[in-house]
Every structure is written in structure tokens, then in C-alpha cells.
């Protein structure tokens, strides 16, 4: 007999119905819970799904450079801001240890005002350059910033007597340089450092940097060549240090890499050893000034000749570019003060500047009047009496004839800057004299032929001539004279 009671059919039916009801209830509860979970997830995730995900741009910061007292080779990587266009990698820079860092010597003398003042029509129609350069150039010195926008360049050209042909001629010249650059980044034969620096200045005058789409590789190669030379020569820059004229190469190259550093620093472009080369090369100029206040061949500090105006003018341009970098240099103020005193001794009563003392070279025409005038404009302002006297000489005696001569481009490289810095009638007269002649003389390949009667120490190399001509045509926008530039 079974120990369990047998359920009646009715009880069995009710039990089965109860089981089915429990299963259905459990399933419904599970479905409701799942639905609630899904709704909760949708509530959380749906807003993010409806918003377009932003584009994430990442870049790798450059590792800090380590000091190494041994000879080494560096494969420079150009780092830049995320928004910048791509550029080529720099060439290999062989670096060597620069001269030991000296302890800074504090200057206790009061620093004179080295900015431009207001001169005769100085800066008329130029604006103040303080409206922001855009495109990452906002912290570039205002005097240099306007060259970096095509619109600003054309505006400067239009407002100051230039035209679109000037811009076209400059671009043709830059393309000529691109085609003729050597594999090591240089131009020129026995004077590679000086010529490469002049060409680099022409590129920078058009705001071409290592990030430039068309000329970035060319510019990077030129900077790399000069930095490599500086590192190998422990702060000195020249093709031949045994040639007494190397003081020219050094100053022009220091000028060029200082200006390059100003752009690269603002654009977060890290070219190895560029900063160090700027510091050592500009400091060399300061530390090797002649006792006269000028600069001499081979940087002879004690030579009785005391230097000359031609050498000195390039050193002064390099010092101005060095100040624009924002880097620290020992005794810069005292150096510039003494140099300006030297320049005063070279100015004749008629306003011209001699080569050594007040004596001009050749036929007596002051081919260095623009150089001397520019030195005072850069470091004292166009209102300075020496600068005014120099401009009066330029107004009366400048000659520019590209077909028959005289046409000393070395003289006019300086005079074109001095004239536009002064502005007014002086610039209008000078611009009318040179602009169209220079444009019409350009060769189809973008170069310029050597002009007749080019003056003392004439050089007929097409790279040299083309670099000077290009810098003259960039004078409309290369610097803003109303805010203390001009180089």
C-alpha cells in the first residue's frame, strides 16, 4: 500500500494549472526586468550616440635633449603643433660640443631705448601689426608677422607702391633657389655659408618655414646646413676660417638662423641644435667686437684699423635678429651702444658713410650710406639725427640703372630698407627708381643677371645677385617700419 495519498483528478488539474501560472509569471517578470535594463542603457547611451564624436589629434612631444660632450650624430625630427601641415625630416646634423658656457656678467648700466621712434613720415600707412598673425604666428614679433599672410602681403604691396608682379617675381626666385639647392642644403661654391644664409633670409622674408608645403624641404635643408657648420666650428660659421673675410659669412649666417629660430620656436618646430647655434653665434659677435666698437676682419679685437662699416653693418643686423629671438645674450646692450658710437665716426658731413672712417670707396660715392642709415634706424629709430642725415644723402645721390649702370645691389639691399623705413617722399621716390627696373631684369628661370657697374667688391654669382634682388622685392612686407624692424 502506498505511503502517499493519491490526488484526485480535480486536484491534479488545479496543481498543473498553478505550475503553468507560476512559469508564465516568472517569464513575464524576467522579460520586464530585461526591458527595464535595456531602457536604462538606452537612456544612458542614446545622447552620446546622437552626438558626433570629435576628431582626436594626438602628437608626441619631443624628448628633452641631453648634453653630450662626445662627438655624436643626430637624426633631427621636426615636432610641430597638431594643426600644422606635414614637413620633411631634417637631414643629419653632426654636432660637436660648443664652447663652455661662461658665467653671465651682470650689466649694471641703464639700458637705453633701442626701439624705433617716430621719424619723418615713419610708418605712414603701415598700421601697428598688433592684430594677430593667425595660423600660429600670433607671437611672432609684430614687425615680422605681416609677411606670413598672403592677404597681408598683397595689402602691404598695394599700400606701399608694390604690385602683384613683385609677389610673382619673388615666388619665381624662390623656385629657382629650390631647383639649384645642393644635396647638403647649401648654395654657392667657396662661399657656401654666406650664400646659403642669404637665400635662407629670402625664404624667411616670404615666411617660408620647415612647415611650408612647397618650400619646407628646401628651408629645412638650408637651416640644417648652417647649424651643422656652426656645431662643427664651435659657434663660428664660415666655409673657410683661414680666410679673413669669414666675419661676413658668420654674421650673415647668425642673422639667418636667429630669424629662423624665431619662426621655428613659435611654430613648435624642434630642429636639434638650432637654439644652441643661435646663442653661440650671436654671442661670438658680442664677445669679439673690436676695441673701436666696430668689427674687423677675422674678428680681430685689437687691430689698429678698427674694422669697417661694411663688416659692422652685418654684425648689427645679426644682433637685431638675436634680440628678436627673446634669448639672453651677455653684454648685448653695451655692445650695441659701442657699435653705434663707431658708426657715428664713419658718417661724413654730407650724411654718407665711409668704408673706413668717413672715406668712401671708389669714385667717392657712399655705397654704404644705406648700411649706416639702417644701423641707426634699427637700433635708435628713424628720428635719429644720423639716420635722417643718411636719408638725405640717399634722396639726393642714389643711382639705380640695371641696364647701363651703376647698379650696386649690395648698396641697394640696404638703401631699399632704409628708404621704406623712412617712408613718405623718400620711399615714393626710391620705389619709383628701382621697382620696375628690377622686375624687368629678371630671367625666365627666376634668377637675375649681374648688373653692369655693380660697384666695389662686385660679385656676379647668380645666387648672390638673385638673393639680394629678392630681398629688395620683399621689402614691402618683410618688416613693419612703424614698429621697430627693418634689417
Language-model features: locations:
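Short hydrophobic/aromatic segments of transmembrane alpha-helices and their interfaces
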Residues: 18-22, 51-52, 169-171
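Intrinsic-disorder/low-complexity signature in envelope-associated proteins
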Residues: 2, 6, 10-12, 45-167, ...
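Membrane interfacial helix-start segments of signal peptides and signal-anchor transmembrane helices
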Residues: 16-39
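Alpha-helical architecture
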Residues: 28-32, 306, 443
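An alpha-helical repeat/solenoid feature that recognizes helix-turn-helix modules
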Residues: 133-172, 186-218, 231-436, 447-485
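Strand-loop microenvironment adjacent to phosphate/nucleotide-handling motifs in alpha/beta enzyme folds
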Residues: 1-2, 35
Amino acid at each position: 500500500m502506498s505511503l502517499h495519498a493519491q490526488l484526485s483528478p480535480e486536484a491534479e488539474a488545479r496543481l498543473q494549472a498553478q505550475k503553468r501560472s507560476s512559469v508564465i509569471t516568472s517569464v513575464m517578470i524576467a522579460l520586464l526586468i530585461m526591458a527595464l535594463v535595456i531602457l536604462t542603457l538606452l537612456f544612458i547611451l542614446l545622447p552620446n550616440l546622437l552626438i558626433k564624436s570629435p576628431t582626436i589629434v594626438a602628437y608626441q612631444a619631443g624628448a628633452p635633449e641631453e648634453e653630450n660632450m662626445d662627438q655624436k650624430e643626430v637624426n633631427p625630427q621636426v615636432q610641430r603643433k597638431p594643426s600644422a601641415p606635414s614637413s620633411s625630416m631634417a637631414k643629419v646634423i653632426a654636432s660637436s660640443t660648443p664652447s663652455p658656457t661662461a658665467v653671465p656678467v651682470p650689466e649694471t648700466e641703464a639700458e637705453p631705448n633701442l626701439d624705433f621712434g617716430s621719424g619723418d613720415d615713419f610708418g605712414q600707412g603701415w598700421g601697428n601689426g598688433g592684430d594677430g598673425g593667425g595660423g600660429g604666428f600670433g607671437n611672432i614679433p609684430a614687425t615680422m608677422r605681416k609677411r606670413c599672410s598672403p592677404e597681408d602681403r598683397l595689402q602691404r604691396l598695394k599700400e606701399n607702391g608694390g604690385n602683384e608682379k613683385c609677389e610673382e617675381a619673388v615666388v619665381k626666385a624662390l623656385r629657382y633657389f629650390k631647383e639649384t639647392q645642393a644635396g647638403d642644403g647649401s648654395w654657392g661654391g667657396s662661399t657656401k655659408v654666406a650664400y646659403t644664409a642669404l637665400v635662407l633670409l629670402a625664404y624667411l622674408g616670404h615666411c617660408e618655414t620647415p612647415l611650408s608645403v612647397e618650400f619646407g624641404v628646401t628651408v629645412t635643408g638650408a637651416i640644417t646646413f648652417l647649424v651643422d657648420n656652426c656645431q662643427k666650428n664651435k659657434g663660428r660659421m664660415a666655409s673657410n676660417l683661414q680666410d679673413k673675410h669669414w666675419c661676413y659669412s658668420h654674421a650673415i649666417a647668425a642673422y639667418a638662423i636667429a630669424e629662423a629660430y624665431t619662426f621655428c620656436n613659435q611654430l613648435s618646430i624642434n630642429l636639434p641644435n638650432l637654439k644652441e647655434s643661435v646663442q653661440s653665434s650671436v654671442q661670438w659677435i658680442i664677445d669679439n667686437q673690436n676695441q673701436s666698437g666696430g668689427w674687423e676682419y677675422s674678428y680681430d679685437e685689437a687691430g689698429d684699423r678698427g674694422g669697417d662699416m661694411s663688416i659692422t653693418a652685418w654684425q648689427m643686423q645679426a644682433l637685431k635678429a638675436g634680440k628678436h629671438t627673446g634669448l639672453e645674450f651677455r653684454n648685448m646692450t653695451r655692445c650695441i651702444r659701442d657699435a653705434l658710437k663707431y658708426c657715428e665716426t664713419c658718417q661724413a658731413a654730407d650724411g654718407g658713410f665711409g668704408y673706413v672712417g668717413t672715406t668712401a670707396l671708389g669714385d667717392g660715392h657712399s655705397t654704404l650710406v644705406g648700411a649706416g642709415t639702417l644701423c641707426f634706424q634699427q637700433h635708435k629709430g628713424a628720428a635719429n639725427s644720423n639716420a635722417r642725415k643718411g636719408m638725405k644723402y640717399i634722396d639726393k645721390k642714389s643711382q639705380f640703372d640695371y641696364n647701363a649702370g651703376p647698379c650696386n645691389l649690395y648698396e641697394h639691399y640696404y638703401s631699399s630698407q632704409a628708404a621704406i623705413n623712412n617712408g613718405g617722399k623718400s620711399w615714393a621716390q626710391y620705389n619709383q627708381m628701382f621697382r620696375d627696373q628690377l622686375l624687368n631684369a629678371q630671367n625666365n628661370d627666376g634668377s637675375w643677371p649681374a648688373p653692369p657697374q655693380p660697384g666695389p667688391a662686385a660679385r656676379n654669382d647668380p645666387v648672390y645677385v638673385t638673393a639680394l634682388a629678392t630681398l629688395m622685392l620683399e621689402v614691402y612686407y618683410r618688416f613693419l617700419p612703424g614698429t621697430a624692424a627693418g634689417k
